[in-house]
C-alpha cells in the first residue's frame, strides 16, 4: 500500500518498478546479490539514470546502482548529499507477478483484492495508519503478492527527483550521489558500497513511513547465527545419552530476556529478534537480529549471546552450541 498524493512521474515509475521481481533470498545470504533478479531492476535504473544525464551511472558486479548528479550553479562548494534506497523486497510473501492497482479509500477496512474468492482486507485495528488516509487513492497489490512499496516507493521518489533536476538544472541542489543497493531485507544493504567513490559527506536512506517523517540517526545492528549440535538416541534408551538440539535451542532462547523482544520494546530500546529457527534432534539453527542505539548496551547484548552459549556448553561438558556474529 502506498499513498498516491504525489506527482504523476513518481506514480508511473512506482507502478512500473513494483512489477519487476527483486526478492532477496536469505538462503543465499553468503553472496551479494542473493538473487539474480535484483539485476533486472538495477539495469533498468542505471539506463534511466544515464538517459537523465547521470553519465557515470553503472551497476557493479554486486548489483549496486551508483550515479552522481553535479551541483547546481552556485552550490558547488556545498557538501555532497547521498540518496539511498534498496532494490530488494522481502521474501515473506510472493514477490513475482505483482499486479498493482489503485483503490479509492473512504475508511473502514481496505479491500486490496480477492484470493480464492475471498476478500483480502486490512483493518484499521491492525493498521491504525489507515485512519489518516481516508479520502485518498492508494496503490495496492491484488492480494496475492507483496506490493513492494518497501522500498520501490523510495526508488521511485529518488528517480523522480533526478528527472526533475534534469528538466530544470537550475533547481538549487548540492552534488548528489545516488545509490540503489541490494539485499537490504536480509541485512546487507550498504555493506559493499564503496563509500570513498560514493563521495558524499551526508546521506539519507529514502525508506520510511508517513509523509514528512525524518530519521536522523540509526541503531547498531548485528546478526547472530546460533548452531546446536545434538545426539540422537532411540527414546527408549535415551536417558543420560540423548542430547536434543531442539531443546538446547529452547534453553538458549530462554536465557535471553523476553522483555527485550521487539513486541515489548519501542523507541531507543534495543532488542533481540528471533527471525527463524529450524530444529531436529540432531541439529538446530537459530538466527537472531540484534539492535540497539546505545553502543555499550549493544555490546552487552552480543556478550549475553556468547555467555548463554558458554553456559550451556559448560552444563553439557562439551561444546555443542556455537555462535557466529556478523
Model feature map: region roles:
Residues 11, 15, 43-46, 155-163, ...:
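Predominant activation on well-ordered alpha-helical scaffold segments within soluble catalytic domains
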Residues 75-171, 175, 180, 200:
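Active-site metal-coordination/substrate-binding segment of hydrolases
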Residues 76-77, 234-236, 295-300:
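Short, conserved charged micro-motifs
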Residues 130-133, 148-156, 161-162, 167-168, ...:
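Glycine-rich anion/phosphate-binding loop at the beta-strand->alpha-helix junction
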Residues 154, 167-245:
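Fold-level recognition of mixed alpha/beta catalytic cores in primary-metabolism enzymes, strongest
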Residues 246-326:
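Metal-dependent amide/peptide-bond hydrolase catalytic core
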Amino acid at each position: 500500500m502506498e499513498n498516491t498524493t504525489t506527482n504523476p512521474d513518481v506514480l508511473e515509475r512506482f507502478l512500473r518498478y513494483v512489477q519487476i521481481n527483486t526478492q532477496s533470498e536469505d538462503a543465499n545470504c553468503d553472496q551479494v546479490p542473493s538473487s539474480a533478479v535484483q539485476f533486472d531492476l538495477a539495469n533498468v535504473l542505471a539506463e534511466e539514470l544515464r538517459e537523465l544525464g547521470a553519465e557515470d551511472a553503472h551497476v557493479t558486479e554486486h548489483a549496486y546502482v551508483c550515479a552522481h548528479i553535479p551541483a547546481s550553479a552556485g552550490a558547488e562548494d556545498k557538501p555532497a548529499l547521498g540518496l539511498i534506497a534498496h532494490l530488494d523486497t522481502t521474501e515473506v510473501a510472493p514477490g513475482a507477478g505483482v499486479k498493482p492497482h489503485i483503490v479509492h479509500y473512504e475508511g473502514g477496512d481496505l479491500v486490496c483484492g480477492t484470493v480464492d474468492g475471498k476478500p483480502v482486507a486490512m483493518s484499521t485495528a491492525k493498521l491504525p495508519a489507515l485512519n489518516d488516509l481516508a479520502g485518498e487513492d492508494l496503490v495496492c497489490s491484488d492480494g496475492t503478492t507483496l506490493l513492494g512499496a518497501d522500498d520501490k516507493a523510495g526508488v521511485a521518489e529518488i528517480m523522480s527527483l533526478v528527472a526533475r533536476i534534469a528538466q530544470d538544472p537550475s533547481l538549487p541542489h548540492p552534488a548528489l550521489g545516488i545509490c540503489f543497493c541490494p539485499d537490504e531485507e536480509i541485512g546487507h544493504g550498504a555493506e559493499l558500497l564503496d563509500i570513498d567513490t560514493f563521495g558524499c559527506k551526508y546521506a539519507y536512506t529514502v525508506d520510511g513511513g508517513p509523509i514528512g517523517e525524518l530519521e536522523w540517526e540509526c541503531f547498531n545492528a548485528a546478526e547472530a547465527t546460533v548452531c546446536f549440535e545434538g545426539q540422537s538416541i532411540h527414546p527408549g534408551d535415551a536417558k543420560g545419552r540423548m542430547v536434543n538440539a531442539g531443546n538446547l535451542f529452547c534453553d538458549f532462547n530462554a536465557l535471553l530476556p523476553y522483555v527485550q523482544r521487539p513486541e515489548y520494546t519501542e523507541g531507543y530500546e534495543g532488542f533481540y529478534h528471533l527471525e527463524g529457527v529450524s530444529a531436529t534432534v540432531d541439529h538446530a539453527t537459530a538466527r537472531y537480529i540484534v539492535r540497539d542505539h546505545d553502543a555499550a548496551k549493544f555490546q552487552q547484548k552480543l556478550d549475553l549471546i556468547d555467555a548463554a552459549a558458554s553456559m550451556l556448553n559448560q552444563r553439557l561438558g562439551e561444546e555443542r552450541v556455537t555462535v557466529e556474529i556478523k
